[in-house]
Amino acid sequence: MSTRVVQRGEGERRYTARGSVMLFKALAEQDGGDFSLMERTLPPGGRRPPPHRHMNCSEAYFVLDGLVSVTVEGEDLEVGPEGFVLVPRGTGHTFGNAGEQEARLLVIHAPAMDAYFAGLHELWLRDKPPTPDEERQLMARFGMNPA
């Protein structure tokens, strides 16, 4: 493992899904799988992930721009710039853009989850969007359960 510097607009991998762009700044392969970090852009009105629980990792959001809605165990929250949300392992949640402008946030998974997003990207590259059942099957492969 070596020190890495990733500048604004740069990333190790770029994935898209549900109209969102995910630019990974840190990947599992770079630090033994301890965590992954992405800069995620959410379009207004974009599709939210189905409510789910990460059974194998915690997830955290730091909002850079815009307004993000986060539902945690049925409680709706709105988080603006410089706001932070920690979703502990096993906690039901979903999130999306709550504003009329694009939202940007940093998303951290510990341990890393970048392999899941690579799979999600592949599902969304097809001619038609994946079915909710296809997304749930992928989620289950990575220790994510419906909430």
Task: Name the predicted role of every residue range.
Residues R8, L23-K25, M38-H54:
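Conserved short histidine dyad/triad with adjacent acidic residue
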